[in-house]
Amino acid sequence: MAVELRYDEEAVFLRRVNRFVVEVKSSRGVVRCHLMDTGRIDHLASPGRRGVLIAWLNRLGGKTVCRAQAFKTAGGVVAVVDSRVPNRLFAEAAPMVVGGDASIEAEREVFGSRLDFLISTGRGLWAVEVKGVNLSLDGVGLFPNAPSARAVKHLEVLARLAREGVKPLMAFVALRPDIRVFAPNYRVDRRFASLACTLLRRGLVGMVGIRVSIDLEPGVVRIRPVATAPVQCPPLQPGR
């Protein structure tokens, strides 16, 4: 089943005002739109280029009058920037990840830690944290696209849960269709990448990628999870 994002027009990106606001040139002039992705977007947009898919907000007042739903890159790839989408996609993809019938609970607290998902199957209990990925380099989806202390904390929580008999899993959900495999982003956040690869190599935290298809139609972006994909870490160097 597809996750749908509605949009009203394609605007010209002008600048990023702050973490949550971008300025665009639209049919209504220069306006400010809410941005739900607090990570970097310089790999998605450049000043003066058309390609911001915006939805008008039906409200009076406020600092923003629209929401940036997605960007079209210079290569024409649609990349979603709505931070609500990764969890919605994972909920659709969960059966292909854990296999068979699954009971899925969102925003569940386990052993004092709030998780994106708690999944119960006949093969055990899964604790899942979901990360959206919209940075792609030659088909490799890299996470994070900016240093993320929060993501490091989530890894530490998952590692602790493994000692409680829960199966910990970090799921990386593609937010653009050209991602084929996934990898921790050493160049941007060495702390996260090093911890992620250590936990993965030791079998302490499972990691999976989810590929998507994206269909752009007039007024709507449709995103579908299509397959799981590996999460790759660079080979260990001698002596490490």
From Swiss-Prot:
UniProt family annotation: Belongs to the SfsA family.
Gene of this entry: sfsA
Pfam families: SfsA, SfsA_N
Signal peptide segment: none
Record-level Gene Ontology MF annotations: DNA binding
Disulfide bonds: none
Record protein name field: Sugar fermentation stimulation protein homolog
